[in-house]
């Protein structure tokens, strides 16, 4: 039964979503409807949480705008998300970065992954995908 649910969910998942993890900085292009007009709004921030799987997968993005921290939770299969770009790959050792909320300025920065670390990370994810299915 579980395998059947997974196969059905695959139809509803967007195929053009890049792989990103907690600690990465992402730029989301959101479709916003204001009255009769429709426009694209860009929301760029740090991924502090990823939870769930399949169509129920959500991720939380945090950005600081004019000194005010702002967090938004997005479902991975959200129809208002036009495009997701990974701006930077972050080097973190936690699955949830809630501690970032209490930090200010330079202390809230996440170290960026080196080029060879990104390639290693991609190779590991490819190997795990091949092993799982």
Curated annotation (Swiss-Prot):
Keywords: Ribonucleoprotein, Ribosomal protein. GO terms for biological process: translation. GO terms for cellular component: cytosolic large ribosomal subunit. One of its GO terms (molecular function) is structural constituent of ribosome. PROSITE patterns: RIBOSOMAL_L19 (PS01015). The keyword Cell membrane does not apply. Signal peptide: none annotated. This protein is located at the 30S-50S ribosomal subunit interface and may play a role in the structure and function of the aminoacyl-tRNA binding site. HAMAP family: Ribosomal_bL19 (MF_00402). Belongs to the bacterial ribosomal protein bL19 family. NCBIfam families: rplS_bact. This is Large ribosomal subunit protein bL19. It comes from Sulfurihydrogenibium sp. (strain YO3AOP1). The gene is rplS.
